[in-house]
Design a protein with these regions (language model features):
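Conserved glycine-rich cofactor-binding loop
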Residues: 11-12
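Conserved glycine-rich Rossmann-like NAD(P)H-binding loop of the short-chain dehydrogenase/reductase
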Residues: 27-41
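Substrate-binding pocket helix/loop in short-chain dehydrogenase/reductase
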Residues: 98-99, 106-108
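Active-site helix of classical SDR
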Residues: 122, 158
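Residue(s) in the substrate-gating loop at a strand-loop-helix junction
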Residues: 142
Length: 279
């Protein structure tokens, strides 16, 4: 029997491709995203992938910061499907810039969307999973949740927070048969980075190093996994009964997490800064 999978942030990118793969495999998708047009077109695609099964997927436009809306969505999903098997928290925004120059209100928004957004969707569905005695809570983290990169201090902080929150959560929910996991990609060839890569202003002491970082990042993205390639790994993790707690999507993430585990910090930093052309 297919799973009922809740996905946030599925209008494009990895979330969209994962939803299509899961639906094609016989799973039922419920999810939301702020992009109403993207959600509508995905609904049509998903319904076309499983017409013979009679399954209906449930997608709605919704802001991750709309807490009452999330609870209504939860109630509608449970009324429609009677259970939920997996929740994938995939909503997130990036944040780039020298720490000295960042807008703290914008930083607060990033932290609220990335961290409290994940907490909100997990908290909404956790009681149902506890009552049914099973379920998986999966959070989209990042390589920078363990290995911070320069000019990504706030984004790194949000992913470090997700990792700590989910680590603690897994101890609390394990007695109820609920599994918890993290997915930690480094780079995927989407427009995610391009949307946030803004050079510091003329005269900034950080401008030249930030320029080199952006140029190198743009170069690396050209050979990064596609959203579909990343989604195949995500779908694989969702379909595992007992997924590993830490899960990587690409070589870069696996490589730097290996360095982080076994090398002295000074040597790891030297390799990282050389890799990003800002040594």
């Amino acid at each position: 029997m297919g799973q009922v999978v809740v996905i946030t942030g599925l209008a494009d990118g990895m979330g969209r491709e994962a939803a299509k793969l899961l639906a094609a495999a016989g799973d039922t998708i419920a999810g939301f995203d702020m992009d109403a047009a993207g959600i509508a077109s995905l609904q049509t695609e998903l319904d076309g992938l499983s017409p013979s099964s009679g399954k209906t997927h449930y997608l709605v436009p919704l802001n991750i910061l709309d807490r009452p809306g999330i609870l209504r969505f939860r109630d509608e999903v449970l009324a429609k499907y009677k259970r939920v098997d997996t929740v994938l928290s995939n909503v997130g925004i990036g944040f780039f810039g020298p720490f000295e120059e960042i807008d703290l209100e914008a930083a607060r928004r990033c932290l609220e969307i990335n961290v409290i957004g994940a907490a909100a969707i997990f908290q909404a569905f956790l009681p149902a999973m506890r009552r049914q005695g099973s379920g998986k809570l999966i959070a989209m983290s990042s390589l920078v949740g363990q290995v911070p990169f320069p000019f990504e201090s706030i984004y790194s902080a949000s992913k470090f927070a997700i990792e700590g929150m989910v680590m603690s959560l897994r101890y609390e929910v394990a007695p109820f048969g609920i599994r918890v996991a993290l997915i930690e990609p480094a780079q995927v060839s989407t427009t995610f980075a391009a949307k946030i890569h803004t050079l510091p202003p003329e005269g900034s002491p950080y401008r030249e190093r930030a320029r080199r970082f952006i140029a190198r990042d743009d170069e690396l993205i050209k050979t990064a996994p596609t959203p579909l390639q990343a989604a195949r790994r995500i779908a694989e993790i969702i379909h595992q009964d007992r997924p590993d707690f830490h899960n990587q999507v690409d070589f870069m993430s696996t490589f730097f997490l290996f360095l982080n585990r076994f090398l002295p910090v000074r040597l790891r930093d030297m390799i990282l800064l050389n890799h990003m052309d800002i040594q």
